[in-house]
A protein has these predicted regions:
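Beta-strand elements of modular eukaryotic interaction domains
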Residues: 28
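Domain-length cofactor-binding catalytic modules of enzymes
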Residues: 2-23, 32-37, 45-51, 55, ...
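A generic, well-ordered mixed alpha/beta core segment in the N-terminal half of proteins
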Residues: 65-124
Length: 386
């Protein structure tokens, strides 16, 4: 159940740092915030605004609150395969997935160039892209990225096979976001706004800057969604080819870094979910833990106090720097025991060790009034960007 920190800030997090609360309070005090900011169970300090926060604004949007990976999110596909139909070793499958889904910072490919060209021909941002940016859009379409982006093969509580994937709008989403954040900061300084944090600078609805940002943001969200779809298609093709059978049953694709116009209590608002997913009644979502723990397929309960939202994952407990200092490759190998993963690159993945994240089971318990669990997944194969 939620805790009211103050009338402008409500939290579902039982495990939350004081710095996280302080950062969220700055956002909640903004005059453009309508009602209260909602903190999800996975909330932690972020760049621009608190990760795991839902920010309702009236007549304005905060580009840094959406963040630099616009449209980052999850996609999960259930197949008509069971655990006993899988080969004894999935190690060859890991190599096959790696060949068709490039990963890593700045990585691109030409595998799906024609599909990328077709998509871009009918989907253009408001900002006129430079030639090198168009090349980036084309080459990074269908690529994973780095950090906590991943592809996983999972089994649910019935031993049914799922493929789960996490990624966003790649380099072009970052570039567009950074450009608009810089414009918002400049306009705020020129207007001599008294902000506690310049990253909370906003665009006012009806201005040219607002219209351009929203158009670019929606385009980047669509790019992220299409990027995940493209990678999922390729991952499924490799899995089904490897097993020799299999058919897709259903697919769930949801953003967790985005803003959209919604009506709550009869009032039209911009609801920004930074590290949160939409959980209106019946909405299906994917909530991952870490690379060695459980993930969940959920249905939203439509809780208005959370602005019909829920967590986007477990949330980091330790920064990447702290995780690297505290844990070794042996620690990571121990926590990934029994799973197929990029063990030969463990030194590049220590900052993603499960112990660097909050307890996903506690996160799910904290939000029992926000979502209903449909399926619990555990990973048997993990491919993560390095």
């Amino acid at each position: 159940m939620p805790t009211t920190i103050n009338p402008k800030l409500i939290s579902w997090a039982s495990d939350i740092e004081p710095d996280t609360i302080r950062q969220a309070e700055k956002t909640a005090r903004l005059p453009i915030v309508e009602g209260h900011v909602a903190l999800m169970p996975d909330a932690h300090v972020g760049l621009g605004a608190t990760v795991g926060s839902v920010i309702p604004t009236r007549g304005a949007v905060i580009p840094a609150a959406v963040g630099v990976d616009i449209g980052r999110g999850m996609i999960a596909t259930e197949l008509d395969l069971r655990a006993d139909q899988l080969p004894d070793s999935l190690q060859p499958l890991l190599g096959r997935i790696e060949r068709v889904i490039p990963a890593g910072m700045g990585q691109g490919h030409d595998h799906v160039a024609r599909k990328a060209d077709r998509w871009f021909a009918t989907n253009r941002p408001a900002t006129e892209l430079e030639t090198k940016q168009v090349t980036k859009v084309r080459k990074q379409f269908g690529t994973l990225g780095s950090g906590n982006h991943f592809v996983e093969v999972c089994l649910d509580e019935r031993d049914h096979v799922w493929v789960v994937l996490h990624s966003g709008s790649r380099g072009i989403g970052n570039q567009l976001a950074q450009m608009h954040i810089a414009i918002a900061r400049r306009l705020s300084r020129e207007a001599m706004e008294d902000l506690e944090d310049i990253d909370l600078a906003s665009f006012v609805q009806g201005t040219p800057e607002f219209e351009r940002y929203v158009a670019d943001m929606l385009w980047a969200q669509d790019y992220a969604l299409a990027n995940r779809e493209q990678m999922m298609d390729r991952a499924l093709r490799e899995l089904i080819g490897f097993v020799g059978s299999g058919r897709e049953l259903r697919r769930i694709n949801c953003h967790h870094n985005f803003t959209q116009r919604e009506v709550h209590g009869g009032v039209e608002l911009w609801i920004t979910r930074k590290g949160a997913i939409k959980a209106a009644s019946g909405d299906l979502g994917v909530i991952p833990g870490s690379m060695g723990t459980r993930s969940y397929i959920v249905a939203g309960l439509g809780n208005e106090a959370s602005w019909t939202s829920c967590s986007h994952g477990a949330g980091r407990r330790l920064s990447r720097t702290k995780a690297k200092k505290l844990f070794s490759t042996d620690d990571l190998a121990e926590q990934m025991s029994g799973k197929v993963w990029l063990a030969d690159r463990a030194s590049k993945l220590v900052d993603e060790i499960p112990s660097a994240y909050k307890d996903i089971d506690q996160v799910m318990a904290d939000q029992a009034d926000l979502v209903e669990v449909q399926h619990t997944l555990h990973q048997i194969l993990n491919y993560k960007g390095t």
